[in-house]
């Protein structure tokens, strides 16, 4: 499927997902999170949940467990975030992604699509510029997302692998950028629908997005990021070109550059 068709599909999906994202589905008690908290955030202290600093929207019940939209936002004037961990408690690899964020992304508005493998809390833990941590999250009803069949398999899945598209549209005095990367992002839990053989894990492990020399976003990801990764990010544009560098678990490297206008 060409990237242009993917873009149209995402636009339709985003419109359809809007009402669901507003559902009241707060975090639930999670023994899995209690066990992993220290390893993930470096402390046993539970970060406070404070919507005045950080919020996370996700559907109460996922239409497609392999393509669950997550949006992480801050209100105007909220303190800047330097690092962010996205955790899906009940996934085989719970840490879906870790982000490093540049000053131009404040206040944060970040969207990503993930796989959810079982009914689970989906949480974001932000580290602020002053070192404090704050958390936001939702409970999502979904199952089987990490093992859901890939859209394509075999060599067909790798056709145009690493192709990227970047678009940017004005959003008030800021801009909303969207990055799409062609990649199967195999989770290691899927099967080839023709051969019925297990497909080894093969996914985008890092993405670095810059505006000129300034960092916008760096992501270290795992198997929970959906096939053909898509990231939407609010930022303050300065007219400089946007460059992207990505690497996957097969040591492939992908690079692209786009004009500051977002073409």
What name fits each language-model region?
Residues 25-31, 143-168, 263:
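Low-complexity, Pro/Ser/Thr- and charge-rich linker/hinge segments at domain boundaries
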Residues 38-67, 154-172:
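N-terminal edge beta-strand
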Residues 57, 69-76, 176-184, 192-197:
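Short edge beta-strand/loop segments characteristic of extracellular beta-sandwich folds
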Residues 65, 117-121, 174, 239-241:
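Extracellular Ig-like/FN3 beta-sandwich strand-entry sites
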Residues 83-87, 206-210, 245:
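Beta-strand signatures of extracellular beta-sandwich domains
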Residues 102-111, 223-234:
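Aromatic sugar-binding surface patches on proteins
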Residues 134-140, 252-263:
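Edge beta-strands of extracellular beta-sandwich domains
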């Amino acid at each position: 499927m060409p990237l242009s068709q993917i873009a149209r599909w995402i636009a339709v999906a985003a419109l359809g997902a809007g009402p669901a994202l507003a559902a009241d589905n707060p975090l639930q008690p999670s023994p899995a999170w209690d066990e992993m908290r220290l390893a993930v955030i470096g402390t046993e202290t539970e970060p406070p949940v404070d919507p005045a600093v950080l919020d996370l929207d996700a559907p109460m019940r996922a239409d497609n467990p392999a393509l669950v939209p997550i949006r992480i936002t801050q209100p105007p004037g909220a303190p800047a975030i330097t690092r962010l961990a996205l955790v899906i408690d009940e996934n085989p690899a719970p840490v879906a992604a870790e982000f490093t964020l540049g000053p131009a992304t404040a206040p944060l508005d970040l969207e990503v699509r993930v796989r959810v493998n079982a009914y689970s809390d989906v949480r974001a833990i932000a580290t602020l510029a002053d070192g404090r941590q704050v958390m936001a999250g939702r409970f999502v009803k979904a199952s089987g997302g990490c093992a859901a069949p890939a859209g394509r398999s075999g060599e067909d899945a790798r056709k145009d692998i690493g192709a990227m598209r970047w678009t940017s549209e004005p959003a008030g005095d800021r801009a909303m950028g969207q990055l799409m990367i062609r990649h199967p992002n195999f989770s290691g839990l899927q099967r080839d629908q023709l051969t019925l053989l297990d497909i080894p894990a093969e996914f985008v492990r890092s993405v670095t997005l810059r505006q000129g020399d300034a960092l916008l976003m760096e992501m270290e990801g795992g198997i929970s990021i959906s096939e053909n990764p898509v990231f939407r990010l609010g930022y303050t544009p300065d007219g400089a070109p946007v460059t992207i560098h990505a690497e996957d678990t097969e040591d492939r490297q992908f690079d692209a550059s786009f004009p500051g206008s977002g073409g």
